[in-house]
């Protein structure tokens, strides 16, 4: 299994990036927050998990070991695949996911596009005994932090990344653009992760 990649970022797309290692380019599917921190032409270290299906093999990338472990734990829930697991981590941090599950907070879990009441209840029931380590902050003990440059990116890049992420999560282009414009007008200092969460909260009426 490919557990990590260190190499040059040669392409950044809407939901994935290509990292070249020893002349081979690997496509890594990841969250908008991670994508926003990658810089084309510069080196990055990304922790990865490979998901093998009958029709495809995909690499998923993560900022730290905690995020990677949560991705795997989420997929133990019946009916929840890698796409929805990644959507969960695009909206909520591993700590927020674990707290919502521990506190039986279905409303917080339903902030994730694709997670309705039934799936939120299923997450709470099936994972309540599996997320205590995340809440305690011990899952990534010994884990390696991703090495990414330029975490603070320009506002226009935040707008583009967040709008594209929202469209990818199922919102219309107009809904996405309006929500991003609103939250950045209220707080121009927001980074991609913060803007995405604020926009999702607005779109869900929170």
UniProtKB/Swiss-Prot annotation:
GO biological process: one example: DNA recombination
Region called Domain III, residue ranges: 154-206
Record-linked CDD domains: UBA_RuvA_C
Keyword set, alphabetical order: Cytoplasm, DNA damage, DNA recombination, DNA repair, DNA-binding
Chain segments carrying region Flexible linker: 143-153
Chain residue ranges for the region called Domain II: 64-142
Region annotation Domain I: where it falls in the sequence: 1-63
Molecular function as annotated in GO: ATP binding; four-way junction DNA binding; four-way junction helicase activity
Subcellular location: Cytoplasm
Transmembrane segments: none
Domain description: Has three domains with a flexible linker between the domains II and III and assumes an 'L' shape. Domain III is highly mobile and contacts RuvB.
Similarity field: Belongs to the RuvA family.
HAMAP family in UniProt: DNA_HJ_migration_RuvA
Its job: The RuvA-RuvB-RuvC complex processes Holliday junction (HJ) DNA during genetic recombination and DNA repair, while the RuvA-RuvB complex plays an important role in the rescue of blocked DNA replication forks via replication fork reversal (RFR). RuvA specifically binds to HJ cruciform DNA, conferring on it an open structure. The RuvB hexamer acts as an ATP-dependent pump, pulling dsDNA into and through the RuvAB complex. HJ branch migration allows RuvC to scan DNA until it finds its consensus sequence, where it cleaves and resolves the cruciform DNA.
SUBUNIT field: Homotetramer. Forms an RuvA(8)-RuvB(12)-Holliday junction (HJ) complex. HJ DNA is sandwiched between 2 RuvA tetramers; dsDNA enters through RuvA and exits via RuvB. An RuvB hexamer assembles on each DNA strand where it exits the tetramer. Each RuvB hexamer is contacted by two RuvA subunits (via domain III) on 2 adjacent RuvB subunits; this complex drives branch migration. In the full resolvosome a probable DNA-RuvA(4)-RuvB(12)-RuvC(2) complex forms which resolves the HJ.
Name used for this protein in its record: Holliday junction branch migration complex subunit RuvA
The organism's taxonomic lineage, starting at the top: Bacteria, Bacillati, Actinomycetota, Actinomycetes, Mycobacteriales
């Amino acid at each position: 299994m490919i557990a990590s990649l260190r190499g040059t970022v040669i392409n950044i797309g809407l939901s994935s990036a290509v990292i070249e290692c020893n002349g081979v380019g690997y496509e890594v599917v990841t969250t908008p927050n991670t994508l926003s921190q990658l810089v084309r032409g510069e080196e990055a270290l990304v922790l990865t998990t490979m998901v093998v299906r009958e029709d495809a093999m995909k690499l998923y990338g993560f900022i730290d070991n905690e995020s990677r472990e949560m991705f795997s734990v989420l997929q133990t829930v019946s009916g929840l695949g890698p796409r929805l697991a990644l959507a969960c981590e695009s909206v909520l941090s591993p700590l927020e996911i674990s707290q919502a599950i521990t506190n039986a907070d279905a409303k917080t879990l339903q902030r994730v596009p694709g997670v309705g009441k039934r799936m939120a209840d299923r997450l709470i029931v099936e994972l309540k005994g599996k997320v205590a380590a995340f809440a305690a902050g011990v899952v990534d003990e010994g884990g390696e932090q991703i090495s990414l440059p330029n975490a603070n990116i320009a506002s226009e890049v935040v707008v583009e990344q967040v709008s594209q992420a929202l469209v990818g999560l199922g919102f219309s282009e107009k809904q996405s653009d309006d929500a991003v414009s609103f939250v950045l007008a209220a707080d121009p200092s927001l980074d991609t992760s913060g803007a995405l969460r604020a926009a999702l909260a607005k779109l869900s009426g929170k």
